Design a protein with these regions (language model features):
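Sec-dependent N-terminal signal peptides
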Residues: 3-12
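Boundary at the C-terminal end of the N-terminal hydrophobic targeting segment
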Residues: 15-17
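Short, compositionally biased P/S/T/A/G/V-rich stretches that sit at domain boundaries
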Residues: 19-45, 50-54, 152
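Beta-strand-connecting loops/turns
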Residues: 37, 115-116
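Short, solvent-exposed loop/turn elements at domain surfaces
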Residues: 40-42, 56-60, 85-87
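Generic short beta-strand segments
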Residues: 49-55, 123-128
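Short amphipathic, basic-aromatic surface patches that mediate peripheral association
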Residues: 50-67
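Extended, well-structured beta-strand/loop surface patches
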Residues: 65-115, 121-150
Length: 152
């Protein structure tokens, strides 16, 4: 009987923990546009960033955590694998020609690229440009890599 009572008392905590882990795993960063395989004859094109369960906030502004899985930050666009956030999990994402920062909290941008093939990936950075993790540094908030081509 004591075991049954203990199980009944603990079950809300187990359900709450499962729900929290589910919410944490639903954090997502992705490209609304362009889509993987995009081809264009125009050098300039619009890139739209998508996010799920993320508060997009400007760089330099520390947002207080309001719950365990609260995730906030701003977008970084990495072109042609110019930087690997997975290899530099605790380092600020640097600035560079192919590492674009959207520290104002922007969710879209117009890019101009010369003809060629490109890979694009989004990474979420915190107020100090460090990569943001879902729960711990085992899983960073990054998008899938997409491939595009700007035609001559």
């Amino acid at each position: 009987m004591k075991i049954l009572i203990l199980i009944l008392l603990m079950s809300p905590f187990v359900a709450s923990s499962e729900r929290m882990n589910e919410e944490c795993s639903n954090v997502e960063l992705y490209f609304k546009s362009p889509q993987d395989g995009f081809k264009s004859k125009a050098k300039e094109f619009k890139v739209e960033f998508g996010s799920k369960n993320i508060l997009i906030s400007p760089a330099g502004v520390k947002v207080e955590k309001v719950k365990e899985c609260f995730v906030s930050g701003h977008h970084h666009l990495i072109i042609n694998g110019a930087y690997d956030v997975l290899d530099n999990k605790k380092q600020p994402i640097p600035y560079g020609k192919n590492i674009l920062h959207f520290g104002g909290g922007q969710t879209e941008a117009n890019l101009s690229l010369p003809p060629g093939r490109y890979s694009l990936q989004l990474a979420l950075g915190d107020y100090e440009h460090r990569p943001v993790a879902k729960i711990d540094y085992n899983e960073l908030v990054i998008s899938e890599i997409i491939n595009i081509e700007i035609m001559p």
